[in-house]
From Swiss-Prot:
Pathway(s) annotated for this protein in UniProt: Purine metabolism
PROSITE patterns for this protein: GUANYLATE_KINASE_1, GUANYLATE_KINASE_2
Originating organism: Salmonella choleraesuis (strain SC-B67)
Subcellular location per the Swiss-Prot or TrEMBL entry: Cytoplasm
GO cellular component terms, A-Z: cytosol
PANTHER family: GUANYLATE KINASE, GUANYLATE KINASE-RELATED
Source superkingdom: Bacteria
Residue stretches making up the Guanylate kinase-like domain: 4-184
SMART domains reported in the protein's UniProt record: GuKc (SM00072)
Record function comment: Essential for recycling GMP and indirectly, cGMP.
Protein known as: Guanylate kinase
Length: 207
């Protein structure tokens, strides 16, 4: 069976990364594409299901996993830990399913060190004006918060060249089509096609 591909997807807040990934998943069967389910030490929110939205663990369990080098990447955010399990990810990839990781550039660097075969995609907004409009979309944040989020977005965008692919999300449907094209092209790589069509190739080359 052909090995699945691990996709790293990063973008500044407001670029539409999560919306694009969710739209992609609606067009792909579960046996083809999945989003990685992270481990976290934060408490479940209403409606969240263990193993579906997150794997909820306590701080001691998480630190034990760090000690065992069980994570492809991990980070602390507002006092809670988040991490991507190496074992879980490798098990899914082994079934031929492509796995998407929605992470920032720092997490992407950690994963590249451990799984250099991963493919990475960076998503940019079409302009700073549009990014500012999207960041203000909720209408709940102060000017100070907006300015801070914009500064964080610029810092994130400065790492775009570290990625394999670049998508500019100006028109959502076009950006989604670009994302699908990347996935399709990766599935047609020689390494995957040789595994997928091994029996056919053997018959075609037989005397």
């Amino acid at each position: 069976m052909a090995q699945g591909t691990l996709y790293i997807v990063s973008a500044p807040s407001g670029a539409g990364k999560s919306s694009l990934i969710q739209a992609l998943l609606k067009t792909q069967p579960l046996y083809d594409t999945q989003v990685s389910v992270s481990h976290t030490t934060r408490a479940p929110r209403p409606g969240e299901v263990h193993g579906e939205h997150y794997f909820f663990v306590n701080h001691d369990e998480f630190k034990t996993m760090i000690g065992r080098e069980a994570f492809l990447e991990h980070a602390e955010v507002f006092g809670n830990y988040y991490g991507t399990s190496r074992e879980t990810t490798e098990q899914v990839l082994a079934t031929g399913v492509d796995v998407f990781l929605d992470i920032d550039w720092q997490g992407a660097q950690q994963i590249r060190e451990k799984m250099p075969q991963a493919r990475s995609i960076f998503i940019l907004p079409p302009s700073k004006i549009e990014l500012d409009r999207r960041l203000r979309g909720r209408g709940q944040d102060s000017e100070e918060v907006i300015a801070k989020r914009m500064a964080q977005a610029v810092a994130e965008m400065s790492h775009y060249a570290e990625y394999d692919y670049l998508i500019v999300n100006d028109d959502f449907d076009t950006a989604l089509s670009d994302l699908k094209t990347i996935i399709r092209a990766e599935r047609l790589r020689m390494s995957r096609q040789k595994q997928r069509h091994d029996a056919l190739i053997s018959k075609l080359l037989a005397d």
